[in-house]
């Protein structure tokens, strides 16, 4: 049964025609419904290789219940089937049968799967463009031999149904179909077709225009009768199509426009054009032009710019117009009737035209003499296919007949070159032109070097230079391109006909030079299969290939093994050799280790295509094409992902115009290869039908923007017609360094206005560097930086530039020495010149390797190309990656003199010149040796890589062993000549002998000797490199480059990789997959274990694990042995190299080993699980050993079986642990080594349980909280670094919708959203979530509770970084009272910049950490440095995790904290970003954002700010629910509905809420309840308010009772849907300090519906308590109770005036009262401002709000005491403005009204200064002093004057508060009357004594903010109430008309009328108030439901 099921599945897979059907059939197995999505996702797939996950998956069905044995068997069978099927894809027979298309989930380029036996039917159902879609799916083979048109209709209908393709309805089409016999291709033809290089990568249109019928003769022209030909010409060019496919119509609109504006001049400049056979058709020029108008594709592909004519010409110099016309006819057919054109019919045969071949060739070659100076026919490299006999004929006749004097080199050569391209139809038309250039080879060779050899992405570029001596072994034109352009490569021996480029095409299969067709077919079928396998494997290789591509690109052609090996000068040459060897080994081994995992998926070779590597560096953050492309092939950008791409910036700059070089070449790179898979990438799998809609197209943009870029007047714009046309067809070319074509549009990046508009200097810099690449030695101009006028803007500048550019590429600029290796060398290096960091060094290699330069030239060279990197206008992101390029580019060291001569001292200049001369001499000496040895070694490497798949067989297994050893044997004699190496290695082997024995015992392999042999050969080389680098410092460039710690670590990584590769290459497939499942995901992290100090640290923590012996996976022991010997040997090298000599190194090692003499193998074996071991190593690899030793000390002081909670409590209570370490070690004590399996599965389908709302009442969260919660959830799902597929419309829209959801959640409370002016929603342009969050909130808003709640809800590690270690003194600001803050130690100035990881003895460090009192200052500084290092190393080890940095404002840069600040920034934003796997979320919090250093608020740092506000009541419920739920308690379902309890305010801030929660939970625990009900909340509120009766007593002052009753009554009457706080007779003593919780409640409820009428209602609420107290509480309170009552009244006054200020801020520019007649329905005249405030008023208001009170007090009060009288107003004003502290007014009610962050003053400066704590200042603008005023001044009050008639607002200052608002009508000014002192109104004050008492106090400063000024004054409260009454009485009497005109009257009128309204309201409800008072006194508590 099992075998039968297996076969059925195989058959079903083969016959699949639809991806949807495939997925449907697959998902029929319900237990594997999620298996598909997991299996084909890279990270999930890796997880699934874990056996434990499989055991869970296979033991459960989709419902989660444990299933029977059937499910397990079924899952195993399906897994085996999947593996076998993937193997079958790569099988050659499977390829030929072409029946398996895994299009749905494996987007494999389909042309790599099946042979090209495409027939008429397959191409019938689509038009040209939509052919791209059909490529994703082929019809089954049953349709191949069909000739019936009805069946064809069915085929087309099927295709149309699935893919929205276009069906041609023309009946003649079907007639023509039946006229031609359709035959099945023969197998040989299929093989040849597979072998055709034109098939490996499909070109742009992918239309099968010319590749349909294989059965015709490939040599002769297809015989087609004229009648049929005529019919084909008459077919409509634009077939019928559906409405959504209108793009093709726009194409022809553009073509019609072009044909009317562009003149076509047929030029016949060659005599050979007249050599036309008589029997050819004659057509005049006019017919030809008219014909072309019918077929405008012709001239679109062949418009070449002639410099002399300034027009577009069709160059067909060697053939007649008639022959061209015939070719055009064929091309027309290829477009109109693509199904009827024989591909082989285009094989241009000279015999078929009756032309004398000898005469023809002679004429053609001779005719080039006159035109060679005018232009070079480097034609658009069009896709071509020729026949062998034609080439042989041409070659033979060329050898016979061509004149020898045409070549400078008498040895005759033949040049045949062509390139993949867009068009496949006019191939022979271009082919003949290519042959013209055979004659003038020397002339074009350098041009081709400059252009075509940089075009390494053309896999099918054939550019062979063959000598006539080769004879029959001549290079066949169909072979894959060979870059054997140089003569010495063509001199290979006959046995060495395969030359490989090992680092680019790792397993590229080439056809050998012999013309054996069988070998040709075989190898080409392999090539096609290999390419297919490459893409299969790449689908799952997201960042396994990225490292390889990036590194290989930098140094891909520069491994010249013996370039500088000078055996006479070993030490110097070794540096050069190692710089290449190490980089090569690193690249090869990285690729090997990264590609091995896919051998068990893809058994074939894995060619790495050139285009993928170069696309890698062009990824732009906003470029949809590149994003789509890279996502489709599975690449991910790591270090360049935030970098502006060097050649392709974004959506706009990708439309660059073609860079037309009219002088020397004619658009040579316009039609470079566009790979088939790149086209497929546009057909997004999720949105296949809409991939061509107008929104995603450029057709409409082009057709509607003709004035900008299709203007025929400007030749530069016209030169971009072709490129713009192709850009219009949705394929913007990737501007590789090989594609020198800029796309010109209205946003052409060279335009100055665009650059200025963008305000990004990086654009100038990028393209400036690009042009510097072009103009290498004739540096015409530079565009680096600045806003220069570029030379490409106007027509008159084009000509000189063209001439200069053409001169650059003409060979007189190149050396004529005959040494062709120069060009090989230069061309090999060219592909990396687009990298501005590497470019200059490459030039150094190229120029120096050719000819020695003079001293002056060298100086000029350095000034030109070796400018300091700091001068390159690097952006932040580029500069960040600079070190990465420097580290990995070994060429930077060859001549690294980054500063020009003028900056160097004379001595240094001489040394550098001598050094350069030596380098030049070496370059000459080893030229010959390089030619023989280097490529010999490379060939061996290539053999090794080509046959790598053989290692699955025993034969290949043995062969590879020998080959591997043979490859390294060439290097061994060179390396083994150093005696130092021998001693070092012997030392290593001796000291690690026990480790080697253990390893040998564990392995028990017969190949042990082989491993030893390889190790002996390879290990010493790398160790020697480290030693020599440290001991030979003659070259400052090399030593500086390779001495950095990163490079040292990298060198050890190479050694490590080498050991792994030796084993893995020789291992069976199953074992490789097993090793990969455990090691591959951790491999990059394990590498850092090789640092020796960490080796010792690792031993300390292993005590924590119980001893558990088991036969573990012994491959890890290989790792561990390598770690052990590395740690032992390299520590000694480090110690001796660090300056202390060998003794120092040995001493340090021995001192460390003294106490910890434990073998690493034994320690690791303690850990039971292999995965646990790797996870443990990862989690602890970066921890500083000091903390680990302390932890080990903990383990020794407690029993081993204690649980972590006891350890944690011991840490908290132990005196032997320093406070600095305590907080950190608690986190460390609960360190988990790996995630649980349920967490891994949970991460795939996760839901937030706390997001549920079971309480049945409205519970909401703040938007910032929601965003953070979503962010944490996304991080848990490993999506933090997910690169969104920006060209996938569905994914983009999904992300944007999700982004809107998490960022713009409504904070609704039954009211509308905010009505602030211009309050728009934010929008992020970058499709990525922010990994850095800055949480801003006032003190008490609960930032720490929010972050801790998120950490509680996430299973990710939560690590707190305490920055108070960095502060050099006591804090000047109050810390957030709810944030964690330790005691702050005074650490003094930090000027010690020693190494952080200083090696100290263990005892010393423990003593330092546990006995702080014995520390010196230096030791304390060292510990401070150690502390931050310890924290961040743990963070990196624990990744992914959440970092919380509370009070980040403490980290401001000053002289003492700059070191810490640099450490923090470096750890957070440089180290973490280097690794693509980092998934760290950084959350910083502050309540003083102005103190946060701006460097931290940057796009790649804390780029998202979240403002946390005080909680609204629904948010309080949510928070309360969360706090309860996370502790295991649940709320009653309808708790907030019962008895109106839902409106109760639970706390004025988050701390109160937490305290209430704790109180309620404690009550629930005592009552043994797990559900919290209403009674528990009541009890908790009651107990919390009572405060256990210790600080609470009943209030004796009945005034406060009346105050509460009045406030509650007003709330109930006016705002029925708002919250009402319970009232009681109990009041805390603290209430006078904290203020009522109602303050912020009312304001924030108000904030959600900010309307004028709402403001009035709230204003009445705020005044209600005071009014009732004034009316009822007549008895004078005593002093103590007056304090509490006053605070409430004072807060009310603040809130009243705050509301008025809010109204002024919101509606300051509202209409005046007379303008509101049209708004009668919504007319609230009280709240209309007469006019907006002017800026001068704002400044004056700000100046009057805060004054440096110390200055005023000291300067002025002393003068008053001396009796000097009135001061000079001007002097006061100057002093005032010189000492102003800008801030909003202090009267804001304690930050409740507007938080200090949200409420800036009118100047936009937020409020921080608390500058007057203790002085009273009265502002007045009256010069004369009245009696009362004199009394005030004499009693110590200060009076001063600001500018006359400018300040309209004045005020009293109490100790930190205003008595009234400065704009209060107490102090308003009359505009129409003379100034009158406000204090002249005697009736305002009850009496003079009351006024004195109210406004005077002791002049001394109070000790705290809570010390009220009126405490020492008797009966102050009573007088205050009288003041209120008299104030209202006075306001009622002030009815002067001028009063109503003043700016401040609206406020006085509002307050007056509101007071009257409330008085009438309460007097009319006196009975109700009396009843409430009695009830309150009886019940002691009144809740809102009882008040109703």
Curated annotation (Swiss-Prot):
Keywords: ATP-binding, Chloroplast, Nucleotide-binding, Plastid
Organism: Cucumis sativus (Cucumber)
Chief location of this protein within or outside the cell: plastid
Cellular location(s): Plastid, Chloroplast stroma
Pfam (any one): Ycf2
Entry binding sites for ATP: 1337-1344
Gene: ycf2-A
Protein name (Swiss-Prot/TrEMBL): Protein Ycf2
Described purpose of this protein according to its UniProt entry: Probable ATPase of unknown function. Its presence in a non-photosynthetic plant (Epifagus virginiana) and experiments in tobacco indicate that it has an essential function which is probably not related to photosynthesis.
